[in-house]
Amino acid sequence: MNRIALAVAVTLALVGCSRSPEPADPASPAAAPAARTAPVALPAAPSDTATATPSFDCAKATSDAEKWVCTDEGLAALDRQLAARYKRAQTAPDEVDIAAEQRGWIKGRDACTRAVDPRQCLREAYQTRLVELTVSSGGVPASATGTYRCDDADKPLKVVFYNDIDPAAAIVTLGTDQAIVFPIESASGSRYGREGVAFWEHQGEATLDFYGTALRCTADR
């Protein structure tokens, strides 16, 4: 299986990168489709007492990240969802690769406790891994694919939208760099983002802020 790196950024620490296959281009038009909006931001402060039920035993939580998950039902729900999806992925022919990726992802998730907003970082880490496992499983059709001409002609922009998976997402490829982004409520056009990345498209015009690189782009016709 052809697998490519997907960037996962945090504010103060780099979350461990995972790998997933190059998504196939659907026959859909390039314009970004309507999508479900991203979840509301999680509460900012943790509790000292386990109040949620993730896939693991909170009494045996060893990392600070696991302890954060144990105090927030939203994160715990994502953890349960990821545990179920990872279990299904373990039946794949490249199970060894997936196990190694998961260990790397756990290290990245644990680094989220050093981020400015640990809960946002944890939420994005879980959502990103869910998308990676879903897309890498194969047979997941994209909602649409957009290709764009940007200010930096040396770095073509491609955005593949997956709005019928949970969580809904898009994979942004700028040159050889990639990031998974999530729908954000927008008054007009389609907006996706994550910490460090913001993509907005409306009627063939797009803007992208990719970890400090700001571009204006036009959709290919």
What is the meaning of each model-derived region?
Residues M1-V15:
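Sec-dependent bacterial lipoprotein signal peptides
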Residues C17-S20:
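Bacterial signal peptide processing site
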Residues D25-T53:
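Post-signal peptide N-terminal segment of mature Sec-exported envelope proteins
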Residues D57, A65-V96:
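Amphipathic, heptad-repeat alpha-helical segments
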Residues L122-G139:
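Short, structured interface segments
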Residues P141-P156, Y192:
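Tryptophan-anchored aromatic micro-motifs
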Residues A168-G193:
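Central antiparallel beta-sheet cores of small beta-barrel/beta-sandwich binding domains
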